Amino acid sequence: ITTRLVGSEMCIRDSDMLTLVISELYKKHLYLLDSDKVDSFDKEIVKQLIQGTASAKDTKGSLMLLTRLMYQQYGKPVILLIDEYDVPVAKANSNGYYEEMLDVMKGLMQALKDNQALCFAVITGCLKIAKESIFTGTNNFISDTITDSRLNEYFGFVQSEVDQILKDADVLDKAESIREWYDGYHFGDFDVYCPWDVMNYLLELQRNPKAKPVSYWKNTSDNAVIRSFIDYAGSNITGKLETLLAGGTIVQRVDENLTYDYLHSSENNLWSMLYLTGYLTKPREEDYNGKLADGT
């Protein structure tokens, strides 16, 4: 399930978007309505979730219910994948209904707590999950971020993958321009390319071999949190941004344990947010010359 669509103010007032997301999820499991392993009471709740007429309580408990019913159906613990868990929380924080959204998300995340039907869950988001209060009471998290080394090569395309893609597409002559435009990240020992940018540019090259690289990723992100920082930026922040835009380097302490309700409590949180969400990256050791901007 992806919670990306859940996050408009309408969602908080009448749960329209959440109801739609859950309905679409349950439509993929219509077999439960015909199963002799699901009792009539649960089938009625499933029908209501599909139709969008379920109570708020049943909607919040829908992930817990679905994992339990799938376990009953197949006799195997369920793997739960939740994509972009924090998009609704970020949007709510930007629009003034953070606490209400936390209540909604807490209900959904009950599926992670004391759930005998759950094998394990994989959750993705911009901010580290351990401290966000929607996960209160959930134990045994293993959190991997871009500052760790275990999964660095999986955050995007590494150089060997890009080389093979360009070879397969017969556009090896574009390697240098693609590196300059889309090789924007350095995680551990890996240079990492943005897959969305690379694939969109290759698609455009198939249509027009003379196409120039452009930034495709910038149109897919919600920049409300970043803009809110910039709106209140003082001269210190402005100066550092100018240094970065000029290709320079600044030194800032990165705090991985951010929560959205405290994002604006310090300037350092801005740099942490920019780094954790991919707007900034750390320099390669061979590119770092030790020269720092004043005040860093």
Language-model features, listed with the residues they occupy:
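Single conserved hydrophobic/aromatic residue that forms the stacking wall/gate
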Residues: I1-G7, C11-I12
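Conserved P-loop NTPase "ATPase switch" module shared by AAA+ and STAND
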Residues: Y74-Y98
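Amphipathic alpha-helical segments of the small helical/lid subdomains adjacent to P-loop NTPase cores
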Residues: S133-T136, D144-L203
